[in-house]
Amino acid sequence: FASASAGLSANVLYAEIGLQGQLGEQVFAAGLRSAERLGQRSGILAIADMTQPSTAKRLFVIDLDSKMLLVRTYVAHGQGSGDLHCTAFSNREGSHQTSKGLYRVGSEIVSPKHGPALLLHGLDKGLNDQALAREVIIHGADYVSPTFIAQHGRLGRSWGCPAVERQLMPQLIDLLADGGLLYVHGR
């Protein structure tokens, strides 16, 4: 797991990636700590900062090896978690809420409802370990777009999935499939 980021403190890595003014330093540090629990401080780490409103580009895809922010985009939260702000989290089937914590991104699938998607394996017991059973996936959605925000004052909401703009799915699949990490941060 050696990488260019090995040995750097979270605050130095945060500064080198250039995340100031975009992603809170404490949120980045929490995501990095979660990845380090797995012994991983290399590869791709995506962080969804659910403390930001859904009108903000709050999904950050970071290459820890090259110390680069690769993607910053919109991400929806579950309809049971709130409207503009994600204020409630659940690991329970049928809650339609977002689950926080660390996920390992699995293989690409084709969802009958959403098209190309990525499986999510929740790694935090009691927080998100029911992700597969709940069918929580990264998928594209028409309700995740600047146009939807302009019409409704917020993004649409999923049934708990971190949904993104449909046209970004090929890029996210390339970056995250089969081993990338996703950290969902919330209060």
Predicted regions and their residues:
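Cell wall/extracellular polymer interaction/catalysis modules
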Residues: 2-159, 166-175, 180
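Low-complexity, Gly/Ser/Thr/Pro-rich intrinsically disordered linker/tail segments
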Residues: 182-187
